[in-house]
UniProtKB/Swiss-Prot annotation:
It comes from Listeria monocytogenes serovar 1/2a (strain ATCC BAA-679 / EGD-e). The lineage of its organism: Bacteria, Bacillati, Bacillota, Bacilli, Bacillales. This is GTP cyclohydrolase 1 type 2 homolog. Disulfide bonds: none annotated. Pfam families: DUF34_NIF3. Keywords: Metal-binding.
Amino acid sequence: MKVANGYEYTAIMEKIAPKKLAMEGDPIGLQVGDLSRKVRKIMFTLDVLEEVVDEAIEKKVDLIIAHHPFLYRPTQHIDTTTKQGKMIKKLIKHDITVFAAHTNLDIAQGGVNNILADLLHLQNTTMIEETYSEPYCKIAVYVPENELESVRLALVNNGAGQIGTEYTECTFHTTGIGSFKPGANANPTIGEKDALTSVPEVKIEAIFPQYLTETITKAVKIAHPYEEPAIDVYTLEMQTYKEGLGRVGMLPKKLGMVSFIDKLKTAFAIDNVRFIGDLKTTVHKVAIIGGDGNKFIHQAKSTGADVFITGDVYYHTGHDLLAINLPTIDAGHNIEKVMKGYLKNKMEEQAKILDYEAEFIVSEVNTDPFQFC
């Protein structure tokens, strides 16, 4: 097994939460440290606080992957007598690198908002606000029949073959005869130099978002037995890859608001929420934006949701929500902590595929600043 470096692990993060999905001005990516260093232990956290850094030092962590960037605003100086300055000093002293995936992880398929929606068992989910779009592409690879599975895995393990939110590993195969004549300096896997060779081959096709072109073609070339594999990639004019903030979906059955709030508290492992609206409301359609959703109340209303779930609702936004008759549950910003276990599992899965050797852990520090008395 290989001990990979920080760049190789952030390449996995790019598959999970592509940087291009982030909202404008969001300071994602490297926060502190050296991505060229070898990584043997990775810790996932919602926030980077001094207590989290102390935990990382104690557990000999090499790379912290956080949801919230702690260097969110431009820093003119680092005063090591302050709490944040001490934290940065500790990170540098102990060679701990910090990487953040923020709104890109909120927006990505399978990211924070999908996890929250899944915990509530929402069905037929769609986005609340579209924030990104680009064309879909289709790849066609021609491969000997006995090597089909290795190429198929290279495609689907790198993001090809997803149609909608519920169908993955979607490919189409056709069989035919491939013919080629290797040159004098070629090193053919099949056939002889300067001789025309005909081979039964399979054409495997799959669609993927355009931004994955380089990742997928590189993976296919590695998996393919030929030194010069035949690969076609073309843009699909009729299909567009879209991502956006928040999720809206249907509960399996209607619930009263009080029962739904109880369900939510259990699902998110929280004891209290703030509520705006009529507790007698019946809930079937649910909209959710993890974190601060104050700017998106009208978009949530336009979905026809019976209730909107978010965090950090401002006092005057509460009045606005009453005015537009959108019952709202403020479940707190900390519910986004669900990303820790999700990223741990995804990273372990990808590291196993790539044969990377590392330990993956989640921070045990509760970073929620609020207590209910």
